Amino acid sequence: MEKLTDFVQEHMGDDLTRLVLDRKKWPDIDIDLAVSCIQSRRKLKGKVQEWFSNPSLIFPAGLSAEQCSSTATAVYKAGLAARIASSDGDMDAALEKIRGGWRLADLTGGLGVDSWMFSKFASEVLYNEMQEKLCMAAEHNFKALGADNIRISNQITAPDTIMEILGDFGANIIYMDPARRGEGGKKVFLIEECTPDVLTLKDIIFERCRHILLKLSPMADITMVCDRLGSSCRQVHVVATGGECKELLIWMDREWEGEYEVVAVELPAGYPDVEPARFSFKVSEEKISPLTLFGRNDIMPSLASRENTTLASREESRDLPHYLFEPGKALMKAGCYNLISERFGLHKLGRSTHYYITEDATKAETLKQLGKVYEIIDCQPLDKRSMKAAGKDYPRAEVTARNIPMDTDTFRKKLGVSSGDDAHIFGLKSDAHGNLLIITRRR
């Protein structure tokens, strides 16, 4: 094994196709495994840095490294599991009070990143994986990482094997991350098409354990998934980081009776040292929440007196500043469009334009944690004249088009601007004012 890991370190920057073609040069090395390790390490760099930095780890399947959790999402997941398992759902329990004293069974172990992170929070973890190569690699890697509280199981997760897998392991919570690839490696999104099929397993699992935590694709339809899973759905955590929605976490509680809660979570840079932003709501709240639109009588900084003025003079003379809020990926995936407006006192540009206006600087600062906030410099009807003027004043700017008769690339070309600087020009549709050109600066 040491020869293999040394070889991997020496050839991290090599052309992998060339390594495969030249395999006869290294008769003592399993080149296929070495290439898989190199591919995996490249994917893990910056994603799970502690694993990348440990030269002793081996990875027999490159796809597993691509699909595994990042350190940030794994930490969030483990913290959530700890709160669920050790406090029967008391989400306000202090983290220092819930470390240890509970057990988790991971029935779809994969590369093992989630099991490894769970082991840092739980007293014991059961890792089960159907692929023998992955299972053997995980056992080796856990030892190399010093994770000595993980049991290893190599079985297919199916209705007739659940009891055998769990054996005498008294799990407080069962975790599953169903594989989202069907025959021929094709991606699937319906929960019943994933492997294992949670719909056929959940009732059997509930005979042994009260809580189930599922990780699903961010592409999954939340309403459809919860309808299929039934009344035991208690919470749906929509987890985003780095400007991307990464995963859906479904907490199922055997004893739960009631409406499920949706929790939109934005993990900031520096997490877990920096607290994540959360926005929780129930679907029924969103349905009855009134829509507050940006109306005809609402005024933003205007370009009406553009002639004979410079950008500096317009900025100095404008009235109370307005802010444009662009919800983050977690909020958008969660489907929170009207309630965010109600809770923060925002005005939505249009029913289908999910951008919001506020004059309140304090609210704007808070909203930065849940998305992006821009200070509005100028705003006017979107037409040839306004685009020409904006392009002249801001030759370097970021550009976004939403719900107007052109996409972002076309809008950028018509403006004649190149990417860069701190200005951001939006082309957005307002129900009250039609298509608008809004010039902003990121806060």
Regions found by a protein language model. Name each.
Residues 1-443:
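SAM-dependent transferase fold signal centered on methyltransferase-like domains
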